[in-house]
Amino acid sequence: THQGAEWVDGSDAWLGEMWPNNEERKREIIRDFDLVADWSQRHNIRILLGEFGAYSKAPQDSRVRWTAFVREQAEAHGFAWAYWEFGSGFGVYDPNVKVWREDLLKALIP
């Protein structure tokens, strides 16, 4: 999710990598969400997924698929969520041309 991020050393090596959107990778995310949900239930503490997103240098279709799946899992597990962020490198809005990144917006708000 940080492909080509200027503040992450070596992240240019990840440029162009696609999130495979296969069952194995989905199970990894589901497993992590299940662990958090179990902890949440045992301790009676609600969860806010306070930050998730994929940097704009990653392939857009991969960003959209990953974002949609993470959002879907957060909602399926009863977690509130907040996308990182509105209008910069991860943004769902492009302030330079004043347009929504529609595919990413639909991944968040279908």
Per-region residue spans from a language model:
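Substrate-binding clefts and catalytic carboxylate motifs of secreted carbohydrate-active enzymes
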Residues: T1-P110
